[in-house]
Amino acid sequence: MKALFYPTFHQTAARGITQRADPRVGPRHRPAAKRKVVKEMAKKETAPYKIYLTENELPTSWYNLRADMKTKPAPLLHPGTLKPLKFEDMQPIFCDELIKQELDNDTQFIPIPGPVMDFYKMYRPSPLVHAEFLEKLLDTPAKIYYKFEGNNTSGSHKLNSAIAQAYYAKAQGLKGVTTETGAGQWGTALSMACSYFDLDCKVYMVKVSYEQKPFRREVMRTYGANVTPSPSMDTEVGRRINAEHPGTTGSLGCAISEAVEVAVSTPGYRYELGSVLNQVLLHQSVIGLETKAACDKYGIEPDIIIGCAGGGSNLGGLIAPFMGEKLRGEKDYRFIAVEPASCPSFTRGKYVYDFADTGKVCPMAKMYTLGHDFIPSANHAGGLRYHGMSPVLSELYHEGLMEARSYEQTAVFEAAVQFARVEGILPAPESAHAIKGAIDEALKCKETGEEKTIIFGLTGTGYFDLVAYQKYNDGEMSDYIPTDEDLAKGFASIPQVDL
């Protein structure tokens, strides 16, 4: 029976092991020269396939990138007066502590509350993964890493901000919150967070995603959320949008308008947003802080950092500490935002003040926008179907500190399938935009022979997006790129703001 547990000499030799391990041969028994070699090897520890930080290495503060920006994002404007918003102007919509975070351009680090830290430990730190198998498939000299945010029930990075926002709502004594969701990741995350803190949660889900992703809404309902397709007939703005655009599949801008209307008209409720706002990018900085800590721990020096871009929450969080280094003149990186060709806010939008929502009830933001009346085609990357972009990222892009590109969805899904077959994760359609960007950069390295290090954000999993994968696998997926005339209609809705 002993041989079952302790291999004999013949068994170990068969495995290529020609010497038995002697437990007495520890560091004290090694020759000095050998001890030196072992010590040098320890200094150059090779990064594992998956880098997991310990709980003790989890960031204890969020990083506020605005503190290091020489040119701050333009202030939000009151939709009625067109004056910069003050704290009291925002109180009917947002939680008080979140308003403070939204307006704070100076505090570099903001402590993460204890209850939020406790919740983070359920699924954080998340892994930084070396995409070795993708590298081999592409036959590239580039090194590719991805920060995987899909290791929680919500399936994405959205939980990082959802739990923070729910905590502040509970601490303020509120009864519940309202929100919008595109593909459903944010709605799922907020429903989880509200369940944890015993808050009501009303979710307005973009109609096309509500119909495409029935199981995503069931997860939300499982966590106690009330889920309504948007535009609905429950709100004044929803009824108006349905009347003006019969048969519309909706947009994030529509859903935001409905959620805000319900929040401001219901006592004890506030609205919580999953992207775009400064406060959201602040919470999502935990992604970048962990990524940088993992890189520093193993001597990984990225050259290119890539993220998908809809409203900017994942991209802004991933690049935050690296962009901070660039702004302070400490290091240089390339940052690439990847968006859908069907909703090209960065690559074809205008950098102006616009309403953050279709119903014009939200504050106005200076951002890259296609116009608040722009309703994109029914792209399967529902989380990227937003007409605008984060004011923080918009300012950075405007200053030339980051790049942007757009892809058609068939090319994106081709990249998603390539990745899934070698890396073993079915990516969300949104995440697949970043994968496509990373693959293209890696193939450029193959052409030039450069050994660049690429990091991209894998924002979440695509297990609720199987209708989209079915369309792609059956050859029924089509691409749509808005014409100049289509964009002109959206641009026509942009208000004239002279400051």
What does each model-found stretch correspond to?
Residues 1-14:
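N-terminal chloroplast transit peptides
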Residues 161, 169-208, 301-315, 335, ...:
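A short, small-residue-rich loop immediately preceding and capping a beta-strand
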Residues 109-111, 241-279, 287, 299, ...:
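Active-site/ligand-binding loops adjacent to catalytic centers
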Residues 148-159, 177-186, 277-280, 306-311, ...:
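Active-site nucleophile and cofactor-binding loops and adjacent substrate-binding regions
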Residues 309-317, 409-474:
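Claisen-condensing/thiolase-fold acyl-transfer catalytic domains that form or cleave C-C bonds
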Residues 44-174:
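Positively charged, low-complexity intrinsically disordered leader regions
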Residues 164-174, 188-200, 221-222, 319-329, ...:
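Alpha-helix C-terminal capping segments
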